[in-house]
Amino acid sequence: MIRRYWNINFEEMMKAGVHFGHGTRKWNPRMAPYISAKRKGIHITNLTRTARFLSEACDLVFDAASRRKQFLIVGTKNKAADSVARAAIRARCHYVNKKWLGGILTNWSTTETRLQKFRDLRMEQKAGRLNRLPKGDAARLKRQLAHLQTYLGGIKYMTGLPDIVIIVDQQEEYTALRECMTLGIPTICLIDTNCDPDLADISIPTNDDAIASIRLILNKLVFAICEGRSSYIRNP
């Protein structure tokens, strides 16, 4: 895999608050190599390590995108949800930004059935057929469609397991991470000072509680994905 330059700027990371970790009482000792200091009761992340692993992650997704691999971005907490959707749509990735429904990946056959039901209901609605049903039936199916849109809308075009999963907040998305580990799906995980850096294939130490920090890291990753897709188009 060729190493590339991704314009990862320390001043930009500082401005976004990437370096701010959790309180010193709320930390995982395994994060010690990724922490550079303590300041006013807060751990400070070593941005040199952040830049290194973010660069490695960008190289990985660029290479995967240039080979037409599929990506899933997962981030369901309120501070991450909007950034996850925007980043995924920009890079034509699948995403989950509401509740992670257990078994989305490990019970893929059930997920496929749900997705087919979702697609069928969308077609029925677009064709206006739901409005021709009795009011009770129409209301029930519309509620079902709204539920599927909320939780599966970001993966409605997914036809198989993803090749790489990008996870925002290891602790919040632990179920999704465990499913990836069970299936052997490579993961890139944004980790704060209270996380375990050994659980993902590439862990990027960062502030996973600040919108600006999450957005910056995701923007770098999706830029690399877009560049990789363009590389495939130029050199199929």
UniProtKB/Swiss-Prot annotation:
Metal-binding among keywords: no
Pfam families: Ribosomal_S2
GO molecular function: structural constituent of ribosome
GO cellular component: chloroplast; small ribosomal subunit
GO aspect biological process, one term: translation
Source domain of life: Eukaryota
Cited SUPFAM superfamilies: Ribosomal protein S2
Swiss-Prot/TrEMBL keywords: Chloroplast, Plastid, Ribonucleoprotein, Ribosomal protein
Gene3D superfamilies, alphabetized: Glucose-6-phosphate isomerase like protein, domain 1, Helix hairpin bin
Keyword Transmembrane: no
Entry's localization field: Plastid, Chloroplast
HAMAP family: Ribosomal_uS2_B (MF_00291_B)
Family: Belongs to the universal ribosomal protein uS2 family.
Official protein name in the record: Small ribosomal subunit protein uS2c
Provenance organism: Manihot esculenta (Cassava)
